[in-house]
Structures are given as C-alpha cells and as structure tokens.
Amino acid sequence: GGKSRRKAIIVLSDGIDTAVRDIDREQMANLPDDQIPSAIKPETSDILQRVLNKADRQGVTIYPLALPTGDPAKLADPTLRQVAMYKAARARLQIIADRTGGVVNTINRLEEMGTLYAKVAADLRTLYTIEYQPINEKRDGKWRTITLETSDTALISRTKTGYFAK
C-alpha cells in the first residue's frame, strides 16, 4: 500500500462561538437559576454536528488548543448563565477532539503555545493507522462506534469514536 499523509487541523480557540453562544443564550433565557447548569446540551449543536460531519468525510484529526479566555474558572464575577455557556463551549472542544481522534490541550500561558504545537507535531509523528474490514457490510449511513484497546501498557490507545457506514 502507498503511504498516505495524515490530515490534521490545530484549532486555536477559547471555544466560544458567537453564533452558538446566541443559541445557548436563547435556550436559557426564561429558565429558573436551578435549571441553568444542565440547560445546554453541548452535543446537540447543529453547528457542531456540521463540523463533525465534515471532519468525518475529510478524515481529519482536530487538535483544539484551548485559550485561557474560555476557561469558566477564570471569569471575573460570572453569572450562572456565563458559566454554563463557557462549560458548554469547552465541552464542544472536547467532543471535537474525541470524535476526530485528537486531543484538547489547554493553554494556561501564551508562552506555552510553542510547546503545545510541538506536542501535537510529536503526536502526529507517532500515530499508527489501523484499518479493518467491518463484519457488518451494510452501507446504511448509520453511526458505528469504534473501540480500540491495547494490552501493551507502554502504548496509548486513542481513536475516533466511530464512523458513518457509507
């Protein structure tokens, strides 16, 4: 087989997408305070699903570098709604990384960026590609979950969480 090049995207972001933030804000608009922490379901964002579907089709691994400005713990005098939106934003970055086989790295100080980029580059150089033929040959467009495990404790097993059977 020929050697194929790995496709990866490094996303430098606080995770706060203004379009999604406005949708999150609408979801919480008339809720009492006790319902705010669980009001936003990060995985249900249409925008997030479009990003994930495109990444799936392109075979891209996404590595979010999370800026400190998106850390809910660093908000000055935050409201319940702000904390909920920032937590949802961080959760979306994690969902993107998990789904595409990447890793979220959190930047605490801007001086760390070079080290984090180097960490992603090292990760890309040490990944192995494993292919398999599924037993279920139906191309029904349904989501199929993947689990990869290794018995060698020196190895780290990380994979996309699944694929659409097309």
Please provide the spans of the model-predicted regions:
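Scaffold/interface architecture of coatomer-like assemblies
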Residues: 1-166
